[in-house]
Amino acid sequence: MGRVTTPSEEDSNNGLPVQQPGTPNQRTRVPVSQFAPPNYQQANVNLSVGRPWSTGLFDCQADQANAVLTTIVPCVTFGQIAEVMDEGEMTCPLGTFMYLLMMPALCSHWVMGSKYREKMRRKFNLVEAPYSDCASHVLCPCCSLCQEYRELKIRNLDPSLGWNGILAQGQGQYEREAPSFAPTNQYMSK
């Protein structure tokens, strides 16, 4: 334990207790986490939570036709992705036009691209990796669009079909899987 100081000792040292020579300097060790607010202690979580993407950001060779199309006209790929992600509310031509308009005019196509990438991540619970959504679309927009296109295609939401094509494909699959029932107008006879 520490030594008790008298008021005269504290006054001579500007109100601080005086350490007597020959006595050990005793300090109590208190964990830093005691001083941290409770929210801070819980906020230290892994931000890369979610499922991994089905393909990597730079796996453009996985769908070569889309890679070529995206390299030449990335606005078309964006329009296809936007139509599927908005469930048909934004048509492919409208999405294509908006992306095409933003590319040269404002050089801010990455804003729309990163917003739709974030929307896709949230919808499918995907991890924000290897880069943030914004960085992916600023540094390699074509690779980002290709990865998003492949992700939708792997999830049976082929952007090349458009939203109505996806619905029609789903309806056809439902009709093939529907159980067959006996005709309704059969009667028993005596």
UniProtKB/Swiss-Prot annotation:
The chain crosses the membrane at residues 94-113. Signal peptide: none annotated. Residues 13-28 have a biased composition (Polar residues). It is found in: Cell membrane. It comes from Arabidopsis thaliana. Belongs to the cornifelin family. May be involved in heavy metals transport. Keywords: Cell membrane, Membrane, Phosphoprotein, Transmembrane, Transmembrane helix. Residues 1-31 are annotated as: Disordered. GO terms for biological process: response to oxidative stress. This is Protein PLANT CADMIUM RESISTANCE 8. The keyword Secreted does not apply. GO terms for cellular component: plasma membrane. Its main location: membrane. It comes from the Eukaryota. The modification Phosphothreonine is found at T23. It is a single-pass membrane protein.
